[in-house]
Amino acid sequence: MHQKITSLLAAVLAVLLCSCGGQPSQQPNLPETPEEAPYAFTLDYHRCAPLVERQIGSDLAAAARLVVDAFLAGETSVTLPEGDYSGNPGNDLGYALNSMCPVFGAVTDYDDNHFDKAARTVTWAYTQTPEQIQEALAALEQTTAAYMSVLRQGDGETARALLLYHALTEPAAYDYEMEHGDGDSTEYQFRTSSYAALVLHSGICYSFAQALAFLYTQAGLDCAAVMGDSETAGLHMWLMAAVDGKWYYFD
């Protein structure tokens, strides 16, 4: 009501000034309503979507957070506490990290062979210099903030999902060169990472699926990248996300 009254008074004042031959001054900038304020966002590499945690288990989600901390500290290994690491924990760990800390998969040689179940250790080597890694982390932080800048406090889950989807996919380009590249090469690991999709706007199907998973997770949307056979593209990865109580596929 206060804002409406202020606007009405400003309009009346402008009319009075014009009728007297005066020039109205610029209407004062009114404060943003809470709903119009920028979305409150803090980058957190520990965030793991609830659906992902249910898929891999809470022990492995906790392991992913330990790996993130060790990676950010410049270390090359971590010893995990006792827990449930059944199945293929090396693959599941990498899967979680792609949507939690995209830089990790882009600048290390990690794959499922680097998870030693017997010793409960995870190891990796860096494929870029410390300076390059810090530049990549800074670039991801800046880019993520730019993505989140399209959101407002009043945006519900549907608005957040659609706005972030558009922000990611509008400049996106498919990396056809890497579609059949050497999966063991450093170049392939970097160019098909979720980091490349986020910062360089380039990648293949799972680059963008995991990149969108990262953005949705940071924005408080439950989601998980899923893989299956596509009628037109063969083996494919896309995103499944919960939006306002319903599950949707995003591709």
Please report, for each region that a protein language model flagged, where it lies by residue.
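Sec-dependent N-terminal signal peptides of Gram-positive bacterial secreted proteins and lipoproteins
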Residues: 2-23
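Solvent-exposed loop/turn segments at secondary-structure junctions
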Residues: 129, 170-175, 204-205, 229-233, ...
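Extracytoplasmic/periplasmic C-terminal soluble domains
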Residues: 183-185, 203, 214
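Secondary-structure boundary elements
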Residues: 133-197
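Alpha-helix capping and helix-loop boundary segments enriched in small/acidic/polar residues
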Residues: 66-67, 200-203, 227
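Linear, non-domain "peripheral" regions
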Residues: 20-143
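A short, highly charged nucleic-acid-interacting micro-segment common to nuclease
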Residues: 194-208
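Hydrophobic/aromatic-rich core segments of domains that either
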Residues: 207-251
